[in-house]
Amino acid sequence: YCWFCRAPLPDKAKKCIESWLKHCPNYTILEWNEDNFDIHQNGYTEMCCKEKKYAFLADYARLQIIENEGGFYFDVDVELVRSLDPLCSEHAFFAFETDRMIATGLGFGAEKHHPLVHFMLEQYAPLLDGKHGVIGCPQLNTQALLKCGLKPNGKRQTVQGAAVFPKAYFNPYEDATGRLYITDCTYAVHWYAKSWMNRRTVLRSKLTRPLHRLLADHPRIKGKVKGGV
C-alpha cells in the first residue's frame, strides 16, 4: 500500500490492514512512502507532493511499484474478507469499479514487468512534466485496458492474459447508497475513505445517501427527478 504525507495512519486504515493480516497471514505487507519511493522522479510526482494531492501520487506510484516488484496492491480503505491465495495463479488481475470503469485502487495484482501494468503507466506520459494537472486512476486505467481489448460491460473477462473481475469481487459496497452486497465471490470491500476530497464534499455524499437509496428502490421517481432537471 502507499501512504504519503508523513501523517499517522487513520484508525480505519489500520483496521483494513488488520484484515489483510488476518486473511493473508503469510504475506509480507509493505508501506511505500517518501522514504522508499522517489517523489522527485518527474514533474508529476513533485507536483502531487507540493500540492498535497497524495491520492493521485499513489495512483501513479502503485503502478510503478507493481511493475518493478510484482505482487498485490490495495488502498488502505480496502478491507479483505477472504484469502488472496486463489489469485496467486493469475499473471495479472484488475477489477471493475462500475460496469464501465476499472480502478486499481480497489485492488490489483501482477507479476513483475507485466505488459498491461507497464501500459497503464504509459498513460501518464502526457502528465509527467507536472504542468497539466491530475487525472483520476479510473479514467487512465480504463483507457489503457480499452486499448487492449477490454469490453466495458462489467463482466468477468480476460484481457491479454489478465483476469478482469466484476464489481462483486472487489467493489460490493455501493458508495452512493451506503449499501453492501457481499457474495461468495467477494474478496474485498472498498470503503471509499475519499482522502482526496475535502470534508464538505465527503459530508455531502453521506447526507445524500438516503435520497440515492430512494431513487434506487423507485425507478419511476428517478425518472421524474431526471426529467425535471
What do these predicted regions represent?
Residues 1-58, 74-229:
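Glycosyltransferase-associated regions of secretory-pathway enzymes
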Residues 60-71:
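Small-residue hinge/turn detector
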